[in-house]
Curated annotation (Swiss-Prot):
Name the UniProt record assigns to this protein: ATP synthase subunit beta, plastid
Subcellular localization: Plastid membrane
UniProt key word Nucleotide-binding: yes
Predominant subcellular localization, coarse grouping: plastid
EC number: 7.1.2.2
The species this protein was found in: Cuscuta obtusiflora (Peruvian dodder)
Family recorded in the similarity comment: Belongs to the ATPase alpha/beta chains family.
Role according to the record: Produces ATP from ADP in the presence of a proton gradient across the membrane. The catalytic sites are hosted primarily by the beta subunits.
Chain's gene name: atpB
Alphabetical list of HAMAP family matching this protein: ATP_synth_beta_bact
Gene Ontology cellular-component terms listed: chloroplast thylakoid membrane; mitochondrion; proton-transporting ATP synthase complex
Length: 494
């Protein structure tokens, strides 16, 4: 049952609800019998009440109506201790989670329950996690750039406002720091907020992210209301039902900020592959015939129902950045292939750039965006981006020759290309606000116009006489001159 938004939703009293009992338990799947005429709807939340006050209630979601007044439901938490005959209550609505400003700075599970030991969430506003995508008339179809203040992203692989971005990065290449910087920048530039959905991620990674966000100020421990992000986690150790629905919980919280607060929202999903994987587990448990490579036959439908809700409306936007795991590096695998159909841009983090100390380690040649078209970004932006890519591509082609024969064996034109490419490579690095406490360098937010101006000047040869180190970890091109002069003064005084 898909509901339209109702943010004044109230839970009816227990006495008025339909009651049934468990007739079968197979792992995280329960079969529940109800009286004739009292059957719950698909996606309704069922609650199995613990026998003692010490035992937690188990919430399940109706997935199938089996006939003979029975339903099949998937549990959102462990089913240890449950037994046949236990009473089950139909809540009458889908799983509903808290929404609004009180969710900022907090960590939630799939049911919207806080798990950070900071007490209950002070809000009466609840919203069901199953909702329809915004109607056509409410959509904002304009193609507009979502400026992030990160030079390499805005210039070479710009994000679309209300679009979806695939973030490809292994361990230790700066994925977490890039995520935190995007959260910080959207809060400052747009007055927006972010929601992070940890879908099937490691508990340690989720804890590390929370601690780093507190250290960098993205989460304000003293004044939680001033935090810029809400966190929703469904870890690897949780049942497949929780991992399958935690993405919808995060999205529901993001939709409130878009529809009611009229804000630009950044939604992170890590990892979208685990959303598909959990759906595959649930599908097998429900007895559905598997499709290609063992995935669920409803893969495209499940992915579409999530992705179509991530969009721009006339009130605000949800821009989504999704980490994508590619099984065995096979891009034709149904899980990543289905995801790619929804992506507007890809941001690829490079281990070789990270090894050089160039952060953010975004690969300028592998990262792509459908927004990088002259009719969308303008002629100047498009031509500058293409010239930058051509210069970096030529440098990449020459690297083998340089490694074998050295720079001296190159032609004058190629040597000039290499020098400018190395300067551009370093200019596309920049200090981050969230890394200030580690690096000691103040963070920089660089506008797109300044990035284009800087790259144009480097390519035109205006800075051929400056050392390439002057371009490393600066903001605008004006800082390059200042840094070069400072280095010159230091060398002179020595």
């Amino acid at each position: 049952m898909r509901l339209t938004p109702n943010y004044d939703y109230e839970v009816s009293s227990i006495d008025k609800k339909k009651r049934g009992y468990i007739v079968q338990i197979i792992g995280p799947v329960l079969d529940v019998a109800f009286s004739p005429g009292m059957m719950p709807s698909i996606y309704n939340a069922l609650v199995v009440q613990g026998r003692h006050k010490q035992e937690p209630n188990v919430t399940c979601e109706v997935q199938q109506l089996l006939g003979n007044n029975r339903v099949r439901a998937v549990a959102m938490s462990d089913t240890d201790g449950l037994m046949r005959g236990m009473e089950v209550i139909d809540t009458g609505t889908p799983i509903s989670v808290p929404v609004g400003g009180s969710t900022l700075g907090r960590i939630f599970n799939v049911l919207g329950e806080p798990v950070d030991q900071l007490g209950p969430v002070e809000t009466n506003q609840l919203s069901p996690i199953h909702r329809s995508a915004p109607p056509f008339l409410k959509l904002d179809t304009r193609l507009s750039i979502f400026e992030t203040g990160i030079k390499v992203v805005d210039l070479l692989a710009p994000y679309r406002r209300g679009g979806k971005v695939g973030l490809f990065g292994g361990a230790g290449v700066g994925k977490t720091v890039l995520i935190m910087e995007l959260i910080n920048n959207i809060a400052k530039a747009y007055g927006g907020v972010s929601v992070f959905g940890g879908v099937g991620e490691r508990t340690r990674e989720g804890n590390d992210l929370y601690m780093e966000m507190k250290e960098s100020g993205v989460i304000n421990q003293q004044k939680l209301a001033e935090s810029k992000v809400a966190l929703v986690y469904g870890q690897m150790n949780e049942p497949p039902g929780a991992r399958m629905r935690v993405g919808l919980t995060a999205l529901t919280m993001a939709e409130y900020f878009r529809d009611v607060n009229r804000q630009d929202v950044l939604l992170f999903i890590d990892n979208i592959f685990r959303f598909v994987q959990a759906g595959s587990e649930v599908s097998a448990l429900l007895g559905r015939m598997p499709s290609a490579v063992g995935y669920q036959p409803t893969l495209s439908t499940e992915m579409g129902s999530l992705q179509e809700r991530i969009t721009s409306t006339k009130e605000g936007s949800i821009t989504s950045i999704q980490a994508v795991y590619v099984p065995a590096d096979d891009l034709t695998d149904p899980a990543p292939a289905t995801t790619f159909a929804h992506l507007d841009a890809t941001t690829v983090l490079s281990r070789s750039l990270a090894a050089k100390g160039i952060y953010p380690a975004v690969d300028p040649l592998d990262s792509t965006s459908m927004m990088l078209q002259p009719q969308i970004v303008g002629e100047q932006h498009y031509k500058t981006a293409q010239r930058v890519k051509q210069t970096l591509q030529r440098y990449k082609e020459l690297q083998d020759i340089i490694a074998i024969l050295g720079l001296d064996e190159l032609s004058d034109d190629d040597r000039l290309t290499v020098a400018r490419a190395r300067k551009i490579e370093r200019f596309l690095s920049q200090p981050f606000f969230v890394a200030e406490i580690f690096t000691g360098s103040p963070g920089k937010y660089v506008s797109l116009a300044e990035t284009i101006r800087g790259c144009t000047l480097i390519l035109s040869g205006e800075f051929d006489d400056l050392p390439e180190q002057a371009f490393y970890l600066v903001g605008t091109i004006d800082e390059v001159n200042a840094k070069a002069m400072l280095e010159e003064e230091k060398n002179f005084t020595k």
